[in-house]
Curated annotation (Swiss-Prot):
Swiss-Prot/TrEMBL GO biological process terms: proteolysis
Organism per entry: Clostridioides difficile (strain 630) (Peptoclostridium difficile)
Name the record gives this protein: UPF0758 protein CD630_11440
Record-annotated MPN domain positions: 113-235
Keywords annotated in UniProt: Hydrolase, Metal-binding, Metalloprotease, Protease, Zinc
Amino acid sequence: MIYLKKSFNSTIKVKEMAPEERPREKMLAKGVKSLSNAELLAILLRTGNKNKNAIELANYIINRDIQGIRHLEDMTIEELCNIDGIGLSKSTQIKAALELGSRVASFKPIKYKIMNPWDIQRYYMDSLRYLKKEVFKAVLLNTKNEIISDVDVSIGTLSSSLVHPREVFKEAIRRSASKIIVMHNHPSGSVEPSREDKNITSRLIKCGEIIGIEIIDHIIIGDGLYFSFKENMII
């Protein structure tokens, strides 16, 4: 049962709160997007502990780390269980909800067509923006600019020695791709291209001209931001 503290230390049930203040009722009346992160988490928790109601407990969990709601993804079930009021049942519900959201975000529709740099960043943003290591990816396109496949070329600190043209073009040749968009993430969140980023791009473009498979863009993904070499007329 969820409780809300009164100023004189007695408690009232959340069901006795004004309807517009209750997370479930608020969601039904105004839509799920009207809820704060704490209210969404409170719906999963359902109850609080002896000192906090569900919303207060949700706020406490979110504010335990500077990353806010995002740090829940890195927490284990055991770590969640160590929080007062969070047992095995609530911990598994939280982790299941996070995984479901992650799978929805990473779902890739078949034959997704790329019309501009915004399309490609939208397609890959959620799967790359939170990674703690740099991942260099080659996205393979057909003649209609539809995604055929993608391949992780390297994982780790980006350098021309790790991003070898052979690995970029090998799968493209096998899949009969006509174009390639290369992309990688910056774990720092910044999307400013480094000198190494530019050198790698130039090298791949030259190789593509020889092979006959065009590198049409290089996208850098940051924390909700992106940088397109094509949009910025670097290529």
